[in-house]
């Protein structure tokens, strides 16, 4: 029995949360596996992709949330994502939880070079992918910063203290994991209550291509005049039986 299952019933995974994880394919890993991630794998799909144990995923997510909630100053928690698909998710996570964040390329020396302008000394580091965020993890190991990481089935766990097994390559999967992590941190802090669903939509944690969003906005703007003209166009019947006018 896991620590979460044997502990408080409040922390146990609800059916609705399990459905969210499955719907966003958080449990579908890669076709490869690392020896360190083997214990988190439940099976394989017909296509050969590894299936991650959802219960172990939830257990590690709750553990990570408890660590983050225990940090007195939220700004002492740094969330990083060199992976493009995770930048929106870490921004929204930081907005709600109050942590600091670094999106895009991680500048070497951010944790180790004190003369650098963006030098910071966080107490906890959260990363989206141990592979793409390897520079941040390596620097954290040099200055004894605990690392929490979203780890796929092929992820290396060197210098990772808390590995949350999940699909860290899908846009919706990354967004869902950070949404759940933010919700659990806020619940542990007492900011929101468990009896009421969190009003924040998970869609806001999903990455959107700026070019795609601009194209949709332009298409909507172009369609607006046509729709207005169509609404203003009608037929008025005249007194004669066979005559109509616009």
Curated annotation (Swiss-Prot):
N-terminal signal peptide:
none
Q: Ribonucleoprotein: present as a keyword of the record?
A: yes
The molecular function GO annotations come to: structural constituent of ribosome
Please cite one Gene Ontology biological process associated with this protein.
ribosomal small subunit assembly
Source domain of life = Eukaryota
Q: Which InterPro entries match?
A: Ribosomal_uS2 (IPR001865), Ribosomal_uS2_CS (IPR018130), Ribosomal_uS2_euk (IPR027498), Ribosomal_uS2_euk/arc (IPR005707), Ribosomal_uS2_flav_dom_sf (IPR023591)
Major localization listed first in the record, in broad terms: cytoplasm
Q: Which UniProt keywords apply?
A: Cytoplasm, Ribonucleoprotein, Ribosomal protein
An example Gene Ontology cellular component term from the record? cytoplasm
Q: Where in the cell is it found?
A: Cytoplasm
| This protein's record includes keyword Transcription regulation | no
HAMAP family (UniProt xref): Ribosomal_S2_euk
Membership in a protein family: Belongs to the universal ribosomal protein uS2 family.
NCBIfam families noted in UniProt: uS2_euk_arch (TIGR01012)
How it assembles, according to the record, is: Component of the small ribosomal subunit. Mature ribosomes consist of a small (40S) and a large (60S) subunit. The 40S subunit contains about 33 different proteins and 1 molecule of RNA (18S). The 60S subunit contains about 49 different proteins and 3 molecules of RNA (25S, 5.8S and 5S). Interacts with ribosomal protein S21.
Task: Relate the protein's function as given in its record.
Answer: Required for the assembly and/or stability of the 40S ribosomal subunit. Required for the processing of the 20S rRNA-precursor to mature 18S rRNA in a late step of the maturation of 40S ribosomal subunits.
Q: What protein name applies here?
A: Small ribosomal subunit protein uS2
Organism for this UniProt entry: Leishmania major
